[in-house]
Structure formats: C-alpha cells, structure tokens
A protein has these predicted regions:
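Membrane-proximal, proline-rich intrinsically disordered regions
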Residues: 55-106, 352, 426, 430, ...
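Short, surface-exposed recognition loops and adjoining beta-strand edges that mediate ligand/DNA contacts
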Residues: 67-72, 97-118, 195-203, 207, ...
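Conserved, well-structured interaction surfaces
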Residues: 121-194, 224, 242-245, 380-385, ...
Length: 530
C-alpha cells in the first residue's frame, strides 16, 4: 500500500485565513470516530491562492508540488493554470488516508445510506454509524468544508479575470467556462449536504455564497438561502455553456475538463433537485448523447478507466499523480492490500433480476461479507475516478418524466439502460405513477452504487435511510466465501449491523444525521454563520 505525503500546509480555514497567522492545532478521526492528533500545522496567510502556481496546464502529466510561483497572477494567460490548480485541490488535496479529495466525500455519502455494509476497517466506519460529519468538531467535517471553499475561491480567481483584445482568446474563455462549471459543481454539493432539499423549503438558510476572490480584508458572509444558491448555480452553468460552445476535449485524458456535455449533466442534476422536470429531462438526454452504454460485465467491472464510453466527466490518474487513487483501497473488495471496507447489503443483491450483467459482480467473500466487485484498483496502484456518466443521465430523464406524469415517455430512457444491462423492457401495465418512480429510484441505487449518490438521494426524495438486518433464517445460511488465496471457506452471511441513529432512534426522513455540519472553527471565526 503506497505512502502519501499530505499537504497539510494548505489546510486553511476559509474565514480564519483572512486574518489568522502562525500555527494551529488540528486533528482527524480514526475509523471509530476517535481523535488522532496531527500536531501543529504551519501555514502562511497569503499562500492560500499562490499554491496554484505549481499547477501547469498539463498538470495531469506532471505531479504538482507545493512550491509557490510568485509569477502566477490573475491575468488571462494564467486562467487555465488557475483552473487546473482549483481542480487539483478538489481531487488531490488530502489530510489523512481516509480524506483524499472529493472522492472521499463520495465514499462517505454512500456509506451513510442504504446499500453499503461497512466491514469494520479503517476509513469510513464512523460514517456508516453517522458519527463524523454530523459533529462540528470532527476532522472529516473540517476537511469537507475547506475542500469545497478553497476550490470555490480558486475558481472565483479564474472567473474574475477580465480580458480584452488579443487576450480574449478561445483558450481563456474555455478556462473561465470550466471554472464556472466547477464552481457550480461545488455549490451544488454544498446545497445538497448542508441543508434539506430545495423542494422542502427553498427559503431555508444553507451556506455562504462567495462569487469574488477573497483577500485578508474580505468580510465573512452569512448563510444564503437555497433559492439564492440554486439561482447562482443555474446562472453559472448557463454562462459556462456559452463560453464552452465549440470546445472539444482533445482526448479521454482531458475528460476532467468540463465541456458542454458536463454542463448539461449538471443542469440536469440541478433541475431534478428543483423540480423543473421538463428542463431536467431535456438537459439529461442532451448530456448523454455520444456516450455509449456498456453491455458487457467485463467493461462494467473495474470502474477505473476514464476512457470508458459511458463516462462524461472523470478525474484521470497516473503513476506520478495518483493520491486520489487511494480511495480505491476502500472500494476494491479483491485487492489483498486494501481495507475492503465497502461491502454490499445482501438484500440489495435481491433487487437484481436474472440476466442482469451486474449480477456477475457479486461474490461472497472474506468473513461472510457480500462483495460487489465494481471498483478495482489497477496493477500500477492507480484508478481513474468517475464523476458523471450517461447511465445517470438516462435515469434523471426517466425520473423527471415520471414525476411529470408522462409514464410512457419515462420508461423509454429507463428501458435504454435496462436493455444495455441485459434486461427486458419494464412492464408498465397496471403501474401507478408512484410505482414507476419507485422502480426508477431503485434502478438508480442498483446502477450508481458506490458513486456517491446514496445520502443525497435520501435527502432529495425525503425518505429515511432503510437498513434491514438479516433475519435469523437468513443469518443461519452458509455460503462458500472467496478468500484472498483463491480458496473458498464457508461462512454465515454478514448484513447490516447498524440500523438506527447513534442516539438509538429509528431512521426518519429529513434527519440532522444526514447533513454535514459546518466546522466549529469556522463558526467560531465567522459569527455571521450562527
């Protein structure tokens, strides 16, 4: 298992960095939520933005360093480099082995939901027990907050650049469009995790909304409403679409750079969250064009290659730049050196029907856990990270049309996906609108397992987390379980072992346990958040 050097000198409070100097204490959580001292973390005020200088336009080919490039200033010729720095921060910045970039938050979100069973190992065991991001003092709470706002601030710098004359090049406009897209992506994440869903109360206060670069004189803001945040997201994406018109990514390794397909995909997600069904379906189907669905389990297994025909947006990894790949050590259930933390609920497997190519991914293994061999780290210990793919877009279109009441139209994109997975068309005969929506939502769970949609779908649909322990009859069965040496050993099955909130109460809709907290250090520094 590889060693990673964490760039803790960049771990700066979004409010505190405006005025605090010197050194401060920081801590992280272990698998059970206990604190592990990390010691004193040094940082310099003005280095918050300057670290971007280490990220060149071909940063995915050359590992960025922590060196400060004093020549990097917010001018049109540097817009692409500043965007690349924002992207690198979002996916490669880490504070612990269990907190490396945005992929760690995707893991967290699925571990908190229905269909993942935690094999009690290092990494996300506390997330499974709703015992980390709900606590303002937790290290992961701190990591999640600063990861987003540092990325937003970097994007704001790129967006703020003005260009005229010869400086107003297509490359400059594309970089600004990409920065707008990533800013919208970050605010969409914040809106879904720090407040209940828009359709519950669009006037609910959520998080601060910053659209200009900050500096030591910036006054910390209070919380904006969900409506204000979603308005900004849609405005950013529509502006980005214009700037990215005509932009073509040169190759698959450039899929980290947003194009209009990515913008349409984010618009589809946003419109689904805000109940704009026609717009959601239209944007989703537009985003999916040209991204062919997989029809073979061999192509499905691994989920580590950005050249996958379904992938619209992803984060590539190379041997020289691969910190984000460490997240595969939690998801990969086969790799001997992995933590193998993410196992499947046996009841989840029961929702699949015969002929589904995804059934081949299930394997009883280890001490009786059900493995889902969807994610595999490559032999060079790297793995590309999926952010958006066409299967999700078909599901968004299906759900949006079903919620509008157009059931006949809704099953068309649903069946496109089902057929690709080896299944016959969904039989609409005698089905109610609610039944069709439920089937589409269940298909989302089957298709997007492990891709970071678990708890946000729970929040969006205002339902409770559902975890059902194995019955005595189910637990008494024995299965041949694959072992790492290639042999098989009989074990009783393992299912959900944490089926209520930490206070002992039952899972309910719209619970505080589903939301991320704002770090206490942030609320202490910014009284406008209280």
């Amino acid at each position: 298992m590889r060693t990673i050097r964490f760039n803790n000198n960049r771990r700066i409070s979004f409010s505190l960095f405006l005025r605090e100097e010197g050194r401060r204490e920081t801590s992280v959580s272990n698998a059970s939520g206990d604190k592990i001292p990390k010691g004193k973390v040094p940082f310099l005020l003005l280095f918050f933005l300057l670290f971007l200088g280490s990220c060149s336009s071909d940063f995915l080919d050359n590992k960025p360093t922590d060196a400060v490039d004093s020549g990097l200033v917010p001018v049109p010729s540097n817009a692409e480099r500043i965007f690349n720095g924002a992207w690198y921060n979002l996916f490669e910045y880490g504070t612990t082995y269990a907190n490396i970039g945005y992929r760690a938050l995707m893991c967290l979100d699925d571990m908190m939901a229905d269909d993942v069973v935690s094999r009690p190992m290092y990494g996300f065991n506390s997330s499974y027990q709703f015992n980390d991001v709900v606590m303002p003092s937790d290290g992961r709470t701190t990591f999640a907050w600063y990861l987003m706002y540092k990325t937003i601030d970097n994007c704001n710098t790129a967006i703020s650049i003005q260009a005229t004359g010869d400086d107003d090049t297509p490359e400059f406009r594309h970089a600004q469009g990409q920065a707008l897209t990533v800013r919208a992506f970050c605010y969409l994440h914040l809106a879904q995790h720090y407040q209940f869903t828009y359709l519950k109360d669009k006037n609910a206060l959520c998080v601060p909304l910053y659209t200009e670069p900050t500096n030591p004189n910036t006054q910390p803001k209070g919380k904006a409403t969900l409506e204000e945040i979603y308005t900004q997201i849609i405005n950013d994406l529509n502006r980005a679409k214009g700037l990215l018109d005509g932009y073509v990514r040169p190759n698959d390794k450039s899929k980290y750079k947003p194009n209009t397909d990515v913008v349409n995909g984010l618009l589809a997600r946003t419109y689904l969250l805000t109940g704009q069904w026609d717009e959601a379906a239209k944007a989703a189907l537009e985003a999916a064009k040209g991204y062919t669905l997989m029809t073979d389990a061999k192509n499905y297994m691994g989920f580590n290659d950005i050249s996958n025909t379904e992938w619209i947006w992803g984060h590539p990894q190379s041997v020289s730049q691969s910190d984000a790949s460490y997240n595969f050590y939690y998801l990969d259930v086969v790799e001997p050196d992995s933590y193998n933390s993410f196992m499947a609920d046996p009841h989840f497997k029961d929702t699949f029907t015969e002929g589904d190519i995804r059934l081949e991914l299930f394997q009883w293994m280890r001490e009786g856990y059900l493995g889902y061999r969807k994610f595999r780290i490559r032999s060079d210990q790297t793995g590309d990270i999926v952010i958006m793919r066409s299967a999700e877009m078909y599901l968004i279109a299906a759900e949006a049309l079903a919620r509008k009441g157009q059931l006949g139209e809704a099953v068309k994109p649903l069946n496109t996906l089902r057929n690709a997975r080896g299944l016959a068309d969904y039989d609409l005969t005698g089905k109610t609108q609610e039944q069709v929506i439920d089937e589409i939502l269940m298909e989302r769970r089957r298709e997007l397992w492990g891709e970071g949609f678990g708890i946000t779908d729970v929040l969006r649909t205002q339902r409770p987390v559902v975890r059902v322990a194995l019955t005595d009859v189910e637990a008494a069965k024995e299965y041949d379980c694959w072992q790492q040496n290639g042999t098989f050993k009989k074990y009783h099955p393992e299912g959900h072992w944490f089926t209520s909130f930490p206070d002992g109460t039952k899972f309910v809709p719209n619970s505080k346990y589903y939301l991320y907290s704002i770090p206490e250090k942030e609320t202490n520094a910014n009284t406008n958040l209280k």
